[in-house]
């Protein structure tokens, strides 16, 4: 694969995190990147864009045509959705390029569940759960790391010099609390507070940074990924990275997660009642967040849900008590006791987690996985 064409939303405020990570990785492994617009200013040079628009280059000149979820559906900070149709080039008859859709949408039932998305060669879906129905062309994917995350955590303090803090300070998130976080705030946070100091410090997201480059990124990311946040990560030993919702084990296609209304409410109540008699574990929906990847990159001891137990699927899975600590509401005491019994275990897991995420989820690593998966599919007709 030599060239990739991205379809991006031409809006400086529209943070297309999927494009940033993948395009940076593709460029790092020698793949040229073009697009329908200039996207993601990388420096204070107004000509320095990650994705470049060249009117001489069209999708027909490239090996892959990639549509960002930010193109079809973008949600601003007002939490209103702005929709656009799938570009004609995605399904053009006689095309010689492969097509991919990057789906980072929250929730279970994302836009890419619609029938027209089956025409993409592949849909790379974050928040994938193998114990739920997922359309046939969806491929498990991950948010991974951006070069900025790696750079801002590169000088993280050695373990022994860090504060014995656990960060529980979700910031750039939804205007509501994830039910999974609320659950673990009851079952996990009071218990882990006996082992680490709970740090709830947050940034003021309404206050733009003074540094011009930081301000540029502040504006392009809808106020995410601040330098001060990475500094806190880099001097803290542990992070709480719980996210999403633990849904009942049935049904296989949980329609009650597809929206509000009376039908969804009744469906949820029915299957919640049924789950009392269902021995299968619950399923973790919308689990993926930047917090998990950022904390691993910073060399922190990361606490999250027990990912495979709840059905989470990634291109490369982390191993519990090797790369992170995966817990369930009912076994928090056991996990913390295991940590306490081995004084060096927390540091080892943090170190191994950092090495694991750099090996498999750096931009270049994700780009190689993307290219390999896309090229393994049948050639376009």
Residue ranges and their predicted role:
Residues 295, 324, 353:
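Hydrophobic, well-ordered secondary-structure elements that form the walls
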Residues 381:
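Conserved binding/recognition cores within well-folded domains
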Residues 21, 85, 183, 331-338, ...:
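Alpha-helical elements of Rossmann-like donor-binding domains used by nucleotide-donor carbohydrate transfer enzymes
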Residues 2-90, 94-316, 320:
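Nucleotide-sugar donor-binding catalytic core of glycosyltransferases
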Residues 339-342, 346, 350, 354-364, ...:
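Conserved short C-terminal alpha-helix that flanks the catalytic cleft of nucleotide-sugar-dependent
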């Amino acid at each position: 694969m030599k060239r990739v064409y991205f379809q991006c939303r031409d809006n400086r405020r529209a943070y297309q995190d999927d494009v940033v990570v993948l395009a940076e990785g593709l460029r790092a492994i020698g793949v040229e990147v073009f697009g329908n617009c200039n996207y993601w200013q990388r420096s204070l040079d107004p000509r320095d864009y990650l994705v470049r628009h060249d009117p001489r280059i069209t999708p027909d000149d490239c090996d892959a045509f990639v549509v960002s979820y930010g193109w079809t559906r973008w949600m601003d900070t007002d939490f209103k959705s702005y929709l656009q149709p799938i570009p004609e080039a995605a399904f053009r008859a006689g095309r010689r390029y492969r097509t991919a859709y990057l789906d980072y949408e929250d929730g279970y039932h994302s836009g890419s569940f619609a029938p027209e998305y089956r025409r993409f060669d592949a849909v790379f879906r974050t928040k994938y759960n193998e114990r739920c129905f997922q359309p046939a062309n969806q491929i498990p994917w991950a948010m991974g790391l951006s070069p900025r995350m790696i750079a801002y955590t590169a000088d993280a303090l050695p373990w022994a010099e860090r504060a014995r803090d656990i960060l529980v300070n979700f910031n750039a998130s939804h205007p509501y609390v994830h039910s999974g976080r609320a659950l673990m705030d009851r079952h996990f946070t009071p218990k882990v507070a006996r082992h680490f100091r709970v740090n709830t410090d947050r940034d003021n997201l309404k206050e733009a940074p003074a540094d011009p480059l930081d301000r540029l990124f502040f504006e392009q990311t809808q106020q995410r990924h601040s330098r001060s946040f990475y500094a806190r990560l880099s001097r803290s030993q542990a992070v709480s990275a719980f996210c999403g919702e633990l849904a009942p084990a049935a049904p296989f296609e949980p329609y009650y997660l597809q929206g509000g209304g009376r039908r969804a409410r009744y469906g949820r109540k029915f299957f919640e009642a049924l789950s009392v008699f269902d021995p299968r574990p619950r399923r973790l929906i919308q689990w993926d967040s930047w917090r998990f990847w950022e904390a691993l990159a910073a060399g922190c001891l990361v606490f999250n849900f027990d990912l495979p137990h709840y059905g989470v699927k990634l291109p490369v899975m982390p191993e519990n008590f090797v790369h992170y600590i995966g817990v369930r509401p009912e076994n928090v005491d056991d996990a913390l006791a295991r940590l306490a019994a081995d004084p060096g275990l927390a540091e080892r897991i943090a170190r191994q987690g950092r090495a694991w995420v750099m090996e498999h989820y750096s931009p270049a690593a994700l780009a190689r996985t993307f290219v390999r998966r896309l090229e393994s599919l049948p050639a376009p007709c």
